[in-house]
């Protein structure tokens, strides 16, 4: 009887749904330990799941199923991050309402997830576009507003005419929108902004106690970008204003020979002289078409002289002011003092525009390059302060004290982190709970009037103006002042997609609560999330924003923990199948891949899998072994035609095969290429398990009711130990390898004893739950194995009875001996000496030392 995976998987998915097998009780138990395991919930795109999605979902499902068997009260929910620009763009492209497309996409995602057998508690399903959900998103915004953490500001922002919305910096690449590639320009616009900078230090400090990938923590540290330095004031020549500059190297002030402003700097227009205005204006127009990322990354730094001058406060020197796009208004003050002798960027700029370079720190050859290291200061003194002879840190401290005393500057901590631009001029997002009175004052909507619901529109395209589509709905926009009853207007911007995903993990705890965001008792029981799994692309934005909101809620007494996610894991990317490429020269001859360089004039030739073979760590042409081919796996994409739909895999091989294969591909965190051949091997493995328990001819049980022998028990208990430890370490691929070893051993036995089969099925169940449930039932159990106890291993049974040990004489292995695992040292040494090849090389009179490492090695050292 073949393994009937379609019938089995359908049967058990129906069983789990009908019995609500994985529903987590609403009430908090008195004495059961919790475990909250969470996936980063998906944006339900129109294309549905691809095979990359199930990787992380399978990993969390394994942990959830394992923890239930250990007696934990497990929370394992799923929901939908459905607001935002992608959903609206898809709706516009298909000419259907976003609500309709979102509902359709969610139904497709949910069907696919259920088909893969994930043990989600679907009773807790949430959707960020549900008014019952975004009521509380709006409520959180009001907490931010009341605490002064949400404010309006005229901000230079990326405006995309085609999309009709403002985009965040990270959504613009080289002056074009990330989605669609539409041109963008920087314009000032009224925006809601969240003061995340107020939490910068706490966001940094909180990283220390988190079990997160170090690379992710470092990305957040760099994004926050804390630095210590000084703000220095440079008086403008011929004007009453002063330029304020932030620098981390105030000790080099005596070496400042020019200044540079960002194109957006508020004083640029005042500083620019008539003679230079045309050049400055044109330069700024060009600069504002570039993204901040491109402005910083471009190798050739450009600029234009403004005609203005500023006074260096330490020596009274008048130095020229330039404008350059490598200076960002978003960092520091948007102005820098340039010290070309000791800054590489300033050095290149000074050489290009023939500006002075003045050494103030000894240690390098500034004619050749900037010296950025430590050293004694020179040429750094005025009548009141001298830095000469001081090294960098001493000089920084001395000049900062002087600046403070003279009121020419002040000690400052600065952050690269910017306040969070929180407005979108789109339709498909959470409305702001804010109204504006006739005199322009903004006021919060009373909490009892939440949610402010998103109106249904027949036409929801962007208006092409900063106001957004909601501004066109007069009967929705027009409202009253909640305090006076006078006419007022609603805020017509909407919140960004990040809003709903900042706090969803809390709503899963108490999804049906109409009175509060989350019940305090439930929150204290479940938080923080014990295991959070999702892609590394969210390392900064989502994870940083969620941490910020959580800390605000902590300060408000809504949550009991300072951090939301205790342990974070990023699953690796599943790449397309390996593609092979050979190269031919002009004569048509093959050129081996290791000889190919960028300058070679060669023709790439795709090679079929069957025409290559592996030779060590490389691939070669099967009929020309001397010719290496290029073997690469690429990210799955429609353009490459290498996207694999999980529905197709499940149709052909079953959900358990897909789950098991994705975990067996390699370590969870690594990128891995898809291999249909390897997946077929995993499917054969599941068939072998089926045949171990089920008779191939009769369809009855193939297990034996006889007592297992000691070797069978040892094999089982070693497998229990390995699988248990590997799940704890999230080494799922090696756990599967251990089960494969068990099956290989069991296939050599006359029959699989029931006492061995039963615990093995439990080991299998987190990985291949459908097959495990079926085998469990056939073994005579009338209840689901979902909450059956995880098997324990017996230390006595896994201890090796006999060990093999190498025996060395003067460091050279001369023999291998077998001894009892618990043998006394004297007995081991005696056995080692009796080994024929050891005795031949050993003279007792010359024996100097006997080295014995229990269970590992014996070494005799002679004179």
From Swiss-Prot:
The keyword Nucleotide-binding applies. It is found in: Cytoplasm. Its EC number is 6.1.1.4. GO terms for molecular function: aminoacyl-tRNA deacylase activity; ATP binding; leucine-tRNA ligase activity. A motif ('KMSKS' region) lies at residues 635-639. ATP binds at residue 638. Pfam families: Anticodon_1 (PF08264), tRNA-synt_1 (PF00133), tRNA-synt_1_2 (PF13603), tRNA-synt_1g (PF09334). GO terms for cellular component: cytosol. Its main location: cytoplasm. Coiled coil: none annotated. GO terms for biological process: leucyl-tRNA aminoacylation. InterPro entries: aa-tRNA-synth_Ia, Leu-tRNA-ligase, Leu_tRNA-synth_edit, M/V/L/I-tRNA-synth_anticd-bd, Methionyl/Leucyl_tRNA_Synth, Rossmann-like_a/b/a_fold, tRNAsynth_Ia_anticodon-bd, Val/Leu/Ile-tRNA-synth_edit. Keywords: Aminoacyl-tRNA synthetase, ATP-binding, Cytoplasm, Ligase, Nucleotide-binding, Protein biosynthesis. It comes from the Bacteria. A motif ('HIGH' region) lies at residues 42-53. PANTHER family: LEUCINE--TRNA LIGASE, MITOCHONDRIAL, LEUCYL-TRNA SYNTHETASE. Belongs to the class-I aminoacyl-tRNA synthetase family. This is Leucine--tRNA ligase. It comes from Salinibacter ruber (strain DSM 13855 / M31).
């Amino acid at each position: 009887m073949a393994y009937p995976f379609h019938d089995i998987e359908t049967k058990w998915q129906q069983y789990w749904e009908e019995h609500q097998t994985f529903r987590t009780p609403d009430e908090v138990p008195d004495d059961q330990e919790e475990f909250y395991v969470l996936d980063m919930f998906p944006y339900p795109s129109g294309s549905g799941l691809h095979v990359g999605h199930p990787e992380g979902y399978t990993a969390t499902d394994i942990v959830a199923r394992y923890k239930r068997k250990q007696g934990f009260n497990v929370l394992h929910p799923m929901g939908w991050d459905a607001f935002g620009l992608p959903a609206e763009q898809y709706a516009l492209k298909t000419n259907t309402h976003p609500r309709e497309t979102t509902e359709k996409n969610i139904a497709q995602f949910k069907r696919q997830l259920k088909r893969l057998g994930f043990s989600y508690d679907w009773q807790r399903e949430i959707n960020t576009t549900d008014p019952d959900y975004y009521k509380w998103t709006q409520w959180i915004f009001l907490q931010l507003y009341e605490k002064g953490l949400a404010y309006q500001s005229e901000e230079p922002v990326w405006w995309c005419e085609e999309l009709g919305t403002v985009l965040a910096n990270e959504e613009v690449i080289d002056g074009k929108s990330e989605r669609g590639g539409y041109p963008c320009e920087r314009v000032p616009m009224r925006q809601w902004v969240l003061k995340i900078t107020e939490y910068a230090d706490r966001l940094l400090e909180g990283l220390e106690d988190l079990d997160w990938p170090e690379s992710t923590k470092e990305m957040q540290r760099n994004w926050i970008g804390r630095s210590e330095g000084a703000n220095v004031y440079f008086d403008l020549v011929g004007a009453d204003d002063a330029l304020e500059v932030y620098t981390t190297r105030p000790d080099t002030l005596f070496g400042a020979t020019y200044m540079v402003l960002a194109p957006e700097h508020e004083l640029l227009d005042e500083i620019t002289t008539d003679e230079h205005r045309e050049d400055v204006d044109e330069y700024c127009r060009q600069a504002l078409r570039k993204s901040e990322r491109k402005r910083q990354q471009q190798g050739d730094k450009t600029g234009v002289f403004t005609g203005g001058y500023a006074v260096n406060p330490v020596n009274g020197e008048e130095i020229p002011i330039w404008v350059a796009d490598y200076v960002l208004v978003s960092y520091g003050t948007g102005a820098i003092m340039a010290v070309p002798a000791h800054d590489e960027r300033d050095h290149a700029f000074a050489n290009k525009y023939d500006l002075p370079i003045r050494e103030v720190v000894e240690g390098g050859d500034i004619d050749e390059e900037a010296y950025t290291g430590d050293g004694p200061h020179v040429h750094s003194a005025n009548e009141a302060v001298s830095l000469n002879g001081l090294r960098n840190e001493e000089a920084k401290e001395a000049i900062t004290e002087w600046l403070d005393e003279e009121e020419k500057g002040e000690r400052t901590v600065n952050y690269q982190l910017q306040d969070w631009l929180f407005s979108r001029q789109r339709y498909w997002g959470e409305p702001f709970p804010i109204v504006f009175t006739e005199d322009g004052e903004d006021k919060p909507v009373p909490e009892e009037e939440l949610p402010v619901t998103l109106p249904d529109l027949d036409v929801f395209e962007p208006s092409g103006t900063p106001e957004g589509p909601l501004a066109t709905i007069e009967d929705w926009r027009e409202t009253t002042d909640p305090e006076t009853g006078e006419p007022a207007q609603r805020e017509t911007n909407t919140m960004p997609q990040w809003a709903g995903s900042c706090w969803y993990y809390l709503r899963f705890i108490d999804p049906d609560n109409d009175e509060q965001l989350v019940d305090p008792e439930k929150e204290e029981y479940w938080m923080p999330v014990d295991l959070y799994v999702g892609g590394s692309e969210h390392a900064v934005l989502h994870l940083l924003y969620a941490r910020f909101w959580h800390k605000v809620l902590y300060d408000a007494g809504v949550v009991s923990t300072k951090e939301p996610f205790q342990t974070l894991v990023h699953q690796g990317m599943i790449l397309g199948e390996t593609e092979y490429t050979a190269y031919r020269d002009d004569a048509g001859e093959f050129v081996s891949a290791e000889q190919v360089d960028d300058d070679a004039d060669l023709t790439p030739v795709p090679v079929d899998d069957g025409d290559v073979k592996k030779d060590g760590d490389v691939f070669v042409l099967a009929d020309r072994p001397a010719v290496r081919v290029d073997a690469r796996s690429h990210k799955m994409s429609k353009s490459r035609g290498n996207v694999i739909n999980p529905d197709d895999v499940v149709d052909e091989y079953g959900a358990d095969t897909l789950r098991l294969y994705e975990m067996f591909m390699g370590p969870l965190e690594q990128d891995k290429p898809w291999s249909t051949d390897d997946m077929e091997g995993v499917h054969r493995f599941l068939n072998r398990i089926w045949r171990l328990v089920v008779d191939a001819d009769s369809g009855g049980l193939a297990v034996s009711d006889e007592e297992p022998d000691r070797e069978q028990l040892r094999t089982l208990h070693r497998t229990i130990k390995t699988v248990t430890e590997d799940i704890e370490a999230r080494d799922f691929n090696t756990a599967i390898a251990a089960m494969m070893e068990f099956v290989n051993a069991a296939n050599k036995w006359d029959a699989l004893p029931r006492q061995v089969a039963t615990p093995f099925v439990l080991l299998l169940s987190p990985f291949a739950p459908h097959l495990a449930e079926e085998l469990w039932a056939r073994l005579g159990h009338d209840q689901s194995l979902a909450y059956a106890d995880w098997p324990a291993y017996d230390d006595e049974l896994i201890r090796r009875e006999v060990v093999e040990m190498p025996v060395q004489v003067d460091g050279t292995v001369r023999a291998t001996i077998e001894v009892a695992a618990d043998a006394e040292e004297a007995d081991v040494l005696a056995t080692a000496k009796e080994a024929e090849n050891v005795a031949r090389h050993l003279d007792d009179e010359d024996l100097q030392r006997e080295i014995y490492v229990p269970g590992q090695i014996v070494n005799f050292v002679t004179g």
